[in-house]
């Protein structure tokens, strides 16, 4: 590089250092994209911009990547280490420099032809200053190719809203070996790079935004809404104009009013907020979503719903991953001043709790959703319908998902892909409110005062987690499961073919399973799981560390799913982090520390335990079986677990099929044996007395679930003809009684939805006949197996209410060996806080 050019770059770099603060996508390109800094890298940029080049250089040096300003010297030939695909517009249009990208690609390919050991990494990089999509009819957006003067003002105004996006590398060795090294291949490389950058720009900014009134006019002109308006006028005996005005009022209520400037401002506010409230936001598997957007997919984000924070957190994360924040389906309860107008500008569109009896509303909403898909906007909705009060996934609400498929049946949309997302927190700001609601308190209506009270309480929220699950392409799903689905395409009438409901139900279940597959274990939910497993909610520091190590080894060596994330920290680091969250108490004595979960915190901590209960449920069940039997064959263990696995699968959205269960259990047994929690004697599994404490704590993780199943099965066995409503009601009443007598502090223990799911599963599995009567010999077999795993006191409580005398005389379980922290008979602790 000449001396004059060095001076020029140094002078240009001075204002850039002051004005530009760019974000890197992905955050760690070396590890996430598999870059090898020791091998030569050719940086490929979309168009000639020295500001872009110097912005890239700053990030390369920060990431320990080669300097793009230093030429590559290979076999005595010196070539630039960066290339611009296009020259871009000039201030003085009469001067157009020669395009050098094709020549440079050809020179590099020639080097590979002459040097078989050479393999240069071609690394595409986009540098973006601002990401406004622009308005329809208002010219081109800010992300267009800019000349020098325009670039100056873009840097001046948008330098703090800039992104450096690294893409997956292309091996020039592979290109040379597979396609040759002539100029045709060089031209093809340049052409493919242009297409890549064009798609990347669209994925980053999205389509142009319509004027709101223009959108309403287009919706009003649709055949479906025209018909609904006519029906409204006829059924309510009002004028056509009045019915049309009703439709416009509904559009005003529903539609978002997306503003890029609002997104930019909120990004500043949220960046400041997250940095003060959270110790970090952990994001996993975002690259798969970036690739979907770049491939032109219409993306529908379907996260689990933990908190009102979810709306803001997911949009913030997507924006920082170089993606367009989605249009978000928000409950109408959030449409209050000032939150409603703010959320609208951030992409929220509002949805009522129910559409029943309002055909005009359902038609307007469905057409609006379809228009979002047609225009290419990404959409987000919570398939659970509301926030989980227990920390578990709720049964999915399928209305919006059904409308998504109906939008496909209008024809003309891009391929729609559902992206399940697990959102997790070490502290959920509403968790105290959830506990009150589960105890029977009436849900407060959202308002400004409630929002301010919530904000006042925000502090020390620990870590946040956003894990993108395995995408579910709708076209692929329908082609596989409903090959004839295209026969139902109709651009006017909303279609409800016979296959729609079963397909939607199956899709909803798959989404929930994939959300759980992407779960994030963390310090808070692991420590809560261990302490709640102890009947006195306390463990010595050594015992707690031992149990954390047991959980971590299980999750690392026998992972639940490939998308599940497990902390890479040691048990000591996790415990220290959890203690800093001020949820637990530490009592010190001359022997050592005792970690205590205070009574008032216990019911709140079940929320975090429930976030990951599905990850440990099968190891807990194996431990429980071995604890009771002391010696059990693998075959017998598989038979017993197979009897209740369908109930666990339905309740916790587990991903293992019945066919996968034997292999899964073998893997878990091998890991438990490796940890010496049990002894593997070949065909038999034997209790290891030396490691009974961690095994007992592990077994406790499934205790309350099995007790709940036993309650329902005991009622079915005692009264086979009991109807479904009565069965669910009686089960809840008995569960409440059990929780009072035995101090069970689990809010979901007598949750209505849990019993409803259980009864539905029993019917599907054949325990309840088509006539509605229980098949007593089947229910008794499972009940006897479950009751054997309980303490005599719990079993007696259940049978004293439900079981007839002749069925309750089963042999009692032998006493479980005691350990200091888990006495055999718990003291009643009063009414449960649930």
Curated annotation (Swiss-Prot):
EC numbers: 2.3.1.15
Metabolic or biological pathway, per its Swiss-Prot or TrEMBL entry: Phospholipid metabolism; CDP-diacylglycerol biosynthesis; CDP-diacylglycerol from sn-glycerol 3-phosphate: step 1/3
Motif HXXXXD motif in this chain: 304-309
InterPro entries in the cross-refs: GPAT/DHAPAT, GPAT/DHAPAT_C, GPAT/DHAPAT_LPLAT, GPAT_PlsB, Plipid/glycerol_acylTrfase
Membrane topology qualifier: Peripheral membrane protein
The entry's keywords: Acyltransferase, Cell inner membrane, Cell membrane, Lipid biosynthesis, Lipid metabolism, Membrane, Phospholipid biosynthesis, Phospholipid metabolism, Transferase
CDD domains (alphabetical): LPLAT_DHAPAT-like (cd07993)
Gene Ontology cellular component terms for the protein in this record: plasma membrane
Start and end residues of each stretch annotated as Disordered: 800-834
Catalysed reaction equations from the record: sn-glycerol 3-phosphate + an acyl-CoA = a 1-acyl-sn-glycero-3-phosphate + CoA
Entry's transmembrane regions: none
Main localization (coarse): membrane
Cellular localization per UniProt: Cell inner membrane
Listed GO biological process terms: CDP-diacylglycerol biosynthetic process; fatty acid metabolic process
Domain notes: The HXXXXD motif is essential for acyltransferase activity and may constitute the binding site for the phosphate moiety of the glycerol-3-phosphate.
Family listed: Belongs to the GPAT/DAPAT family.
Name of the protein in question: Glycerol-3-phosphate acyltransferase
């Amino acid at each position: 590089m000449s001396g004059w050019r060095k001076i020029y770059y140094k002078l240009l770099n001075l204002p850039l250092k002051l004005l530009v603060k760019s974000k890197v996508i992905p955050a760690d390109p070396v590890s996430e994209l598999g870059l090898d800094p020791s091998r030569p890298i050719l940086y490929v940029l979309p168009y000639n911009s020295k500001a872009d080049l110097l912005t890239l250089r700053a990030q390369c040096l920060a990431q320990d990547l080669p300097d793009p300003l230093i030429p590559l010297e290979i076999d005595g030939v010196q070539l630039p280490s960066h290339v611009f695909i296009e020259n871009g517009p000039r201030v003085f249009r009469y001067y157009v420099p020669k395009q050098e990208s094709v020549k440079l690609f050809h020179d590099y390919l020639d080097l590979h032809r002459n040097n078989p050991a050479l393999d240069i990494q071609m690394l595409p990089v986009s540098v973006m200053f601002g990401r406004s999509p622009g308005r329809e009819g208002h010219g081109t957006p800010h992300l267009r190719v800019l000349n020098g003067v325009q670039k100056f003002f873009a840097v001046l105004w948008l330098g703090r809203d800039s992104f450096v996006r690294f893409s997956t590398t292309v091996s020039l060795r592979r290109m040379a070996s597979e396609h040759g090294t002539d100029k045709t291949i060089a031209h093809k490389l340049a052409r493919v790079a242009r297409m890549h950058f064009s798609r990347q720009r669209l994925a980053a900014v999205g389509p142009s935004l319509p004027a709101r009134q223009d959108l309403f006019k287009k919706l009003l002109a649709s055949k479906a809404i025209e018909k609904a308006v006519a029906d409204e006028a006829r059924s309510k005996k009002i004028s056509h104009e009045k019915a049309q005005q009703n439709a416009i009022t509904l559009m005003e209520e529903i539609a978002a009013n997306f503003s890029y400037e609002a997104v930019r401002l909120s990004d500043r506010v949220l960046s400041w907020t997250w940095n003060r409230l959270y110790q970090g936001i952990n994001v996993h598997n975002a690259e798969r979503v970036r690739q979907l957007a770049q491939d032109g997919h219409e993306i529908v984000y379907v996260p689990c719903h933990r908190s009102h924070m979810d709306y803001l957190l997911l949009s913030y994360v997507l924006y920082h991953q170089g993606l367009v924040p989605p249009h978000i389906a928000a409950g109408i309860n959030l449409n209050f001043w000032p939150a409603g107008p703010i959320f609208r500008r951030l992409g929220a569109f509002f949805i009522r709790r129910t559409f029943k009896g309002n055909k005009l509303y359902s038609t307007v909403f469905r057409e609006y959703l379809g228009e979002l898909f047609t225009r290419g906007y990404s959409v987000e909705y919570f398939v659970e319908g509301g926030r989980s009060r227990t920390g578990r996934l709720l049964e999915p609400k399928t209305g919006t998902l059904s409308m998504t498929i109906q939008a496909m049946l209008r024809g003309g949309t891009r391929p729609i892909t559902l992206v399940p997302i697990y959102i997790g927190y070490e502290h959920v700001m509403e968790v105290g409110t959830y506990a009150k609601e589960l105890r029977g308190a009436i849900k407060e209506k959202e308002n400004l005062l409630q929002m301010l009270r919530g904000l006042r309480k925000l502090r020390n929220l620990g870590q946040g987690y956003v894990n993108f699950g395995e995408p579910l392409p709708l076209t692929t799903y329908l082609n596989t499961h409903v090959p004839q689905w295209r026969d139902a395409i109709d651009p006017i009438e909303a279609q409800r073919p016979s296959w729609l409901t079963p397909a939607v139900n199956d899709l909803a279940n798959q989404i929930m399973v994939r959300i759980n597959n992407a779960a994030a274990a963390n310090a808070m939910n692991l420590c809560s799981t261990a302490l709640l497993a102890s009947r006195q909610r306390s463990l010595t520091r050594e015992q707690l560390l031992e149990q954390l190590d047991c959980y971590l080894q299980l999750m690392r060596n026998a992972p639940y799913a490939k998308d599940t994330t497990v902390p890479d920290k040691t048990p000591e680091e996790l415990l220290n982090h959890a203690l800093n969250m001020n949820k637990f108490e530490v009592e010190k004595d001359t022997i050592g520390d005792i970690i205590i979960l205070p009574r008032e915190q216990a019911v709140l901590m079940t929320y975090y335990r429930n976030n990951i209960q599905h990850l440990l449920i099968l190891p807990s069940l194996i431990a429980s079986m071995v604890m009771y039997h002391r010696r059990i064959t693998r075959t017998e263990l598989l038979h017993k677990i197979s009897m209740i696995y369908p109930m666990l699968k339905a309740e916790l959205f587990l991903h293992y099929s019945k066919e996968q269960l034997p292999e899964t259990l073998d893997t878990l047994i091998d890991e438990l044996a490796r940890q010496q929690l049990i002894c593997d004697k070949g065909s038999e599994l034997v209790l290891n007395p030396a490691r009974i404490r961690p095994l007992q704590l592990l077994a406790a993780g499934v205790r309350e679930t099995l007790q709940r199943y036993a309650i329902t099965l005991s009622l079915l066995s005692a009264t086979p003809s009991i109807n479904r409503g009565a069965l669910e009601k009686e089960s809840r009443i008995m569960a409440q009684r059990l929780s009072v007598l035995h101090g069970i502090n689990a809010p979901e223990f007598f949750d209505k939805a849990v019993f409803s799911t259980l009864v539905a599963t029993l019917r599907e599995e054949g325990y309840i006949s088509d006539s509605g009567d229980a098949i007593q010999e089947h229910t008794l077999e499972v009940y006897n197996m479950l009751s054997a795993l309980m303490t005599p006191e719990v079993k007696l409580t259940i049978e004293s209410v439900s079981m007839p005398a002749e069925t309750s005389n089963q042999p009692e379980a032998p006493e479980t060996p005691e350990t200091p922290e888990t006495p055999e008979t718990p003291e009643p602790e009063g009414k449960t806080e649930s």
